[in-house]
């Protein structure tokens, strides 16, 4: 019925189509999919640029954790261009236009690839796409599912059609409790629906250094003035913004309209208010005097960078009945956000912002000015904003971890795993090698995957916290306790033995510890997966002393040459050993190094001032139980 109605509608409408619409459809139906491979794919479908940005963290985590090809389909032109630009450097990510739910084109794609998972971002429910993927017995999920106030009444009228389609979807990860209730009321199976929170909370945006921000202010030619950014403004909001601006002193106003076709109207408003302005494009041509009151942005893609240097940040679509745009972008750059009363599109986020007092909701000029005065006079809310993102940053990661477990056929994957390690087929096996597959959220064993993490560990962990490495993590007793004590640091444990890796991962999973990753790597391979200045700490506990063949020890001059590259200035190396000669040799070695100094050492750790906070390794506990032997301990600082 759907396809018949679709065909009739297209046939009747085609003669009246404008050329722009014909081009839009032809572009999507004439795509060449010959470069798609007969390999496993995850297909992620986004409607527009908003969903492309929203799903970025999700895409990156699927890409890094699943090791599968990613196919991204996008409905709009701007969304497609944004996705192509975003993933142009990723060989295993392919971006296409969504083929407007054309059954033939969808099957052309499905017949070329081995689809493991279809991810529908927000509520992109296309009947042919869902039916054909379901026919192939591939899993379908909805991520960041949302049923808006406007859509819900329409959907209720179509419930008799929607129910069968919704029941073909394996799982719904919904934004809020109300969205969960609505999708269930429309026919989704209750047990397959979960409120996981809004994926927007899990955003990972571009970061700018202090030098970059200083240079950007110089480019904007704004001197020492404070910056008031009005982002994504809509018709009816600019008048209010201008009235507020006229009440401020020593500010430059930067207006970023949601749609650039409104620029002429905004220019007229500025002139009517007897204010001066320069267009962003004029700044690029060096035609600014540096004295203009306002910068009017006539370019796409610069709003986030502007938020990063702002003193006051307003998000549009909220002073008029639009429903609000992305309130999280200013917060990501640790800016207290101001918005209006119309937040129906971002209602959960708005409520959380107000609850935490990291933003202000205003209805008029007076309230707006008062909010600005409060921001200027009160202490920075960085700590609360950090807490806000920290608590919500794991939404995408948790979805990916769960789906990756479901996707993997353990027997087939295990066969590939054996080949990966031993390059042959064998019937006998180490049972713990196969158990690595049960902990993809913790354990990495593929060298290519680990190399991809180089310089990108902050993306993997979902934050920019300090990174510490433990060489020889054993069964994880030391590192899991260290991670529990230090939730604002990330930890990477290196271990070669399968059983130890599995036991370490089990300890972390049991305690829901998220800031740890385990790599099947040697300590000599640090530069394979760590970039320059990427770590702040290293722990080496009870390494083999290699008596008689000391050249094999891990702590030698070559380790410090590696630390010269991968460790930040003021970074720390912590070393424990029961071997007195090894202890003294390390002390002597550090004396010969210009870039390092010993800031603390003791030959009897358990009777020192460091004993109280010492975390005992498995070996340390066993050794203390069986022997009455002193434990040596050294703290080494990188001073250059």
UniProtKB/Swiss-Prot annotation:
Cellular component, GO, one term: tRNA methyltransferase complex
Identification of the protein by name: Bifunctional glycosyltransferase/methyltransferase
PROSITE patterns for this protein: SAM_MT_TRMB
Matches recorded under HAMAP family: tRNA_methyltr_TrmB
Record: active site: 544
Name of a matching Pfam family: Methyltransf_4
Region of interest called Glycosyltransferase, as start-end residue ranges on this chain: 1-438
Gene this chain is encoded by: trmB
Biological process according to GO: RNA (guanine-N7)-methylation; tRNA methylation
Residue numbers spanned by region tRNA (guanine-N(7)-)-methyltransferase: 439-640
PANTHER family tied to this protein: 3-DEOXY-D-MANNO-OCTULOSONIC ACID TRANSFERASE, MITOCHONDRIAL-RELATED, 3-DEOXY-MANNO-OCTULOSONATE CYTIDYLYLTRANSFERASE
EC number of this enzyme: 2.-.-.-, 2.1.1.33
Binding of S-adenosyl-L-methionine, residues: 470, 495, 544
């Amino acid at each position: 019925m759907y396809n018949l109605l679709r065909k009739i509608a297209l046939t009747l409408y085609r003669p009246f189509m404008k050329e722009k619409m014909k081009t839009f459809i032809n572009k999507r139906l004439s795509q060449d999919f010959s470069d798609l491979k007969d390999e496993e794919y995850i297909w992620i479908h986004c409607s527009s640029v908003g969903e492309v940005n929203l799903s970025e963290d999700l895409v990156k985590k699927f890409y890094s954790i699943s090791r599968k090809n990613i196919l991204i389909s996008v409905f709009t032109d701007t969304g497609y261009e944004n996705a192509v630009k975003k993933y142009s450097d990723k060989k295993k990510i392919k971006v296409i236009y969504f083929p407007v739910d054309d059954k033939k084109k969808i099957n052309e794609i499905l017949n070329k690839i081995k689809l493991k998972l279809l991810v529908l971002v927000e509520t992109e429910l296309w009947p042919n796409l869902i039916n054909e993927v379901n026919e192939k017995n591939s899993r379908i999920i909805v991520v960041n599912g949302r049923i808006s106030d406007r859509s819900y009444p329409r959907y209720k009228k179509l419930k008799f059609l929607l129910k069968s389609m919704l029941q073909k979807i394996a799982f719904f990860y919904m934004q809020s409790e109300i969205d969960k209730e609505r999708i269930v009321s429309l026919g989704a199976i209750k047990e397959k629906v979960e409120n996981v929170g809004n994926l927007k909370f899990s955003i990972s945006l571009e970061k700018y250094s202090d030098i970059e921000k200083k240079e950007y202010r110089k480019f904007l030619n704004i001197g020492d003035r404070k910056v008031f950014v009005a982002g994504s403004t809509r018709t009816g909001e600019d008048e209010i913004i201008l009235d507020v601006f006229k009440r401020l002193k020593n500010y430059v106003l930067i207006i970023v309209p949601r749609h650039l076709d409104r620029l002429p109207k905004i220019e007229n408003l500025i002139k009517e208010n007897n204010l001066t302005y320069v267009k962003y494009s004029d700044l690029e041509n060096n035609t600014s005097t540096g004295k203009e009151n306002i910068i009017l942005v006539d370019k796409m893609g610069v709003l986030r960078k502007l938020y990063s240097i702002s003193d006051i940040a307003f998000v549009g679509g909220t002073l008029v009945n639009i429903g609000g745009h992305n309130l999280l972008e200013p917060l990501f750059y640790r800016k207290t956000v101001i918005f209006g009363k119309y937040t129906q599109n971002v209602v959960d986020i708005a409520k959380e912002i107000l609850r935490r007092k990291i933003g202000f909701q205003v209805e008029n000029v007076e309230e707006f000015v008062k909010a600005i005065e409060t921001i200027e006079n009160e202490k920075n809310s960085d700590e609360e904003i950090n807490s806000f993102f920290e608590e919500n940053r794991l939404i995408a990661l948790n979805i990916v971890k769960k789906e990756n477990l479901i996707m993997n056929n353990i027997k087939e994957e295990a066969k590939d795993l054996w080949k990966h390690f031993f390059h042959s087929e064998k019937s006998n096996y180490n049972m713990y090698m196969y158990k690595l597959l049960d902990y993809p959220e913790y354990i990495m064993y593929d060298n290519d995957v680990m190399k991809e993490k180089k310089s990108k560990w902050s993306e993997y962990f979902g934050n920019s916290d300090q990174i510490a490495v433990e060489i020889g993590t054993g069964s994880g007793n030391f590192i899991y306790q260290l991670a529990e004590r230090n939730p604002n640091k990330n930890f990477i444990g290196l271990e070669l033995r399968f059983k130890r890796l599995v036991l370490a991962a089990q300890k972390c999973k049991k305690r829901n510890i998220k800031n740890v990753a385990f790599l099947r790597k040697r300590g000599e391979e640090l530069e394979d997966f760590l970039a320059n200045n990427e770590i702040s700490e290293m722990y080496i506990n009870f390494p083999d002393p290699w008596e008689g063949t000391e050249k094999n020890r891990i702590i030698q001059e070559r380790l410090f040459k590696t630390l010269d590259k991968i460790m930040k200035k003021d970074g720390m190396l912590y070393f424990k050993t029961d071997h007195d000669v090894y202890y003294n040799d390390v002390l002597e070695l550090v004396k010969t190094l210009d870039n390092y100094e010993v800031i603390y050492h003791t030959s009897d750790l358990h009777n020192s001032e460091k004993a109280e906070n010492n975390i005992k390794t498995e070996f340390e506990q066993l050794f203390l139980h069986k022997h009455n032997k002193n434990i040596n301990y050294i703290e080494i600082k990188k001073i250059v």
